[in-house]
């Protein structure tokens, strides 16, 4: 395992090192009020970042499309096709966490720091070719959410970028045994990966329509924007399929008290439980993505629905009980009662139930589900 990427790829480790160093200098020069420090989290922060080999296919004059491993066959006999040697490149977003000082007003500070870091995000997204995101976090909120997988992964694997070191920034957050994560984290994983699957199902329909238009000649074959959009749509669908497979496996392990902080060990734990090997293949795809998905959408859909039943089967009475606190949280933040059938259940459980119905019925997420998920995610 490298500093940032999975496996041996020193050139990408250096790329991320250099980018973080330069971003650190840029952030320091901004002198952003109430900002305590910035770290790189996510896969590249804990040495689990993905690597893809990129071929740049040049179609016609001034038109380029990035592909994995194999060239794009062109249907235009007048087009030129030139390929460069494959080069390793980043395959995932760079997820930075900007930690505020203690005792600051939450919404105002998050908005101000987010706006101040926006030019840095935009500049480096363009330079690196992957999304460079800054999530602004308040210390007390991280402490409040310390039982969440996202927080636990962050405090276990990060790379210092600017300001105070992570050791100081995260000193108040307890490290939790992976096997003792609460069942609600399994529900949250199923909710989020289910939403990603719904987005992929919706996007896949758009891509199919676009390909049909290209075949019919409704869209000119010389329109590189249409081709590039198809490539991006497929990439989006493939990534969410993979995240779904990984998320379902992780949720199962959390619900059974078998979770582990290293993804390779989670794959081994699932293999010991007699899984079909799909999770292990998804791990390989995560580290070395290709243009072919780990499975098709229907397989991902069936896997999610099966996983939902496994996770729900392990729910405890406290997690699936109706309480005044749950009702109050929903009413205050959503300003509506919502479905009577699930009223006063934990908001994550309520949204998970809605996600399940949408996936079961192959329905696109409606405005109500989107709003619920955005508020309680």
Which ranges hold each PLM region?
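Short, well-ordered alpha-helical segments
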Residues: 271-283
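Short, polar/flexible loop-turn hinges at active-site or ligand-entry regions and domain interfaces
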Residues: 102-111, 161-165
């Amino acid at each position: 395992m490298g500093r940032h990427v999975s496996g041996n790829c020193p050139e990408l480790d250096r790329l991320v090192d250099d980018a973080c160093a330069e971003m650190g200098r840029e952030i320091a020069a901004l002198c952003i009020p109430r900002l305590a420090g910035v770290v790189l989290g996510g896969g590249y922060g804990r040495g689990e970042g993905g690597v893809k080999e990129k071929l740049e296919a040049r179609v016609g004059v001034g038109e380029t499309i990035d592909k994995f491993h194999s060239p794009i066959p062109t249907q235009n006999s007048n087009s030129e096709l030139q390929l460069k040697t494959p080069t390793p490149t980043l395959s995932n977003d760079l997820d930075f966490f900007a930690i505020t000082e203690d005792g600051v007003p939450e919404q105002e500070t998050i908005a101000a720091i987010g706006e101040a870091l926006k030019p840095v995000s935009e500049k480096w997204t363009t330079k690196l070719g992957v999304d460079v995101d800054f999530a602004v976090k308040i210390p007390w909120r991280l402490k409040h959410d310390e039982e969440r997988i996202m927080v636990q992964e962050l405090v276990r694997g990060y790379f210092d970028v600017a300001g105070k070191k992570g050791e100081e920034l995260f000193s108040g957050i307890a490290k939790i045994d992976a096997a003792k994560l609460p069942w609600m984290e399994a529900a949250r994983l199923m909710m989020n990966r289910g939403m990603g699957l719904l987005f992929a199902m919706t996007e896949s329909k758009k891509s199919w329509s676009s390909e049909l238009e290209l075949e019919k000649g409704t869209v000119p074959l010389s329109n590189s924007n249409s081709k590039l959009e198809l490539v991006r749509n497929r990439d989006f669908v493939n990534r969410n399929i993979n995240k779904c497979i990984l998320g379902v496996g992780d949720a199962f392990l959390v619900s059974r008290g078998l979770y582990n902080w290293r993804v390779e060990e989670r794959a081994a734990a699932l293999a010991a439980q007699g899984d079909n090997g799909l999770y292990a293949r998804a791990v390989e795809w995560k580290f070395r993505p290709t243009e072919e998905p780990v499975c098709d959408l229907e397989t991902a859909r069936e896997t999610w629905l099966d996983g939902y039943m496994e996770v729900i089967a392990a729910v405890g009475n406290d997690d699936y009980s109706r309480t005044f606190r749950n009702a109050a949280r929903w009413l205050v933040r959503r300003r509506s009662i919502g479905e009577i059938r699930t009223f006063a259940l934990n908001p994550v459980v309520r949204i998970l139930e809605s996600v399940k119905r949408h996936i079961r019925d192959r329905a696109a997420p409606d405005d109500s589900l989107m709003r619920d998920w955005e508020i309680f995610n």
